[in-house]
């Protein structure tokens, strides 16, 4: 009788340890995916809001390299006007991510709210106040890489 009780307790403990191990593994995977989404969205926002007219071609390519889906298609069509406008206006903007957090996750897609500060340099003006924006960035994971698939400025 004691042997049967010992076996039952042993099986229950093994089941509990297995379940706890699985839950820890699942939590680790969710944290890894959350970090991947937040990092990709933050980098995508910084890429989008950092432009130097002297390197506008490289800046536009950097945006495309971190994009996928409809955002990639849309920016690809507007890439040349983005470059031309940056050069014409002699834009020098530096976007810095001040905070970011995952709003929702659905499979291989996540939506991240990103707060950014954008500072501009204009030699004609002595002092320029930074601009503060919030951007909702949708990120799509393909394989081990996550890229920006949509960007919406939040009022």
Predicted feature residues:
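Solvent-exposed, non-transmembrane alpha-helical starts
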Residues: 123-129, 149
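A short, acidic/glycine-rich surface segment
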Residues: 47, 120-125
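Ser/Thr/Pro/Gly-rich low-complexity linker/stalk segments immediately outside membranes or between
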Residues: 21-37
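Short beta-strand edge/turn micro-motifs at domain boundaries
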Residues: 111, 132-155
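Amphipathic, hydrophobic N-terminal targeting peptides for secretion and organelle import
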Residues: 1-26
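Core segments of small alpha/beta cavity-forming domains
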Residues: 32-92
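Surface-exposed, charged secondary-structure patches
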Residues: 88-122
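A mature extracytoplasmic/lumenal domain signature
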Residues: 79, 114-118, 152-153
């Amino acid at each position: 009788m004691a042997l049967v009780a010992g076996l039952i307790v042993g099986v229950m403990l093994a089941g509990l340890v297995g379940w706890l191990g699985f839950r820890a593994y699942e939590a680790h995977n969710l944290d890894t995916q959350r970090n991947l989404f937040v990092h990709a969205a933050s980098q995508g926002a910084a890429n989008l809001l950092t432009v130097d007219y002297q390197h506008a071609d490289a800046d536009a390519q950097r945006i495309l390299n971190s994009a996928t889906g409809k955002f990639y298609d849309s920016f690809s069509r507007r890439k040349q006007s983005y470059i031309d406008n940056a050069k014409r206006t002699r834009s020098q903007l530096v976007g810095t991510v001040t905070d970011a957090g995952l709003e929702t996750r659905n499979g291989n897609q996540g939506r991240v709210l990103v707060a950014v500060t954008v500072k501009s340099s204009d030699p004609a003006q002595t002092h320029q106040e930074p601009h503060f924006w919030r951007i909702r960035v949708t990120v799509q994971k393909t394989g081990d890489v996550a890229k920006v698939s949509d960007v919406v400025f939040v009022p």
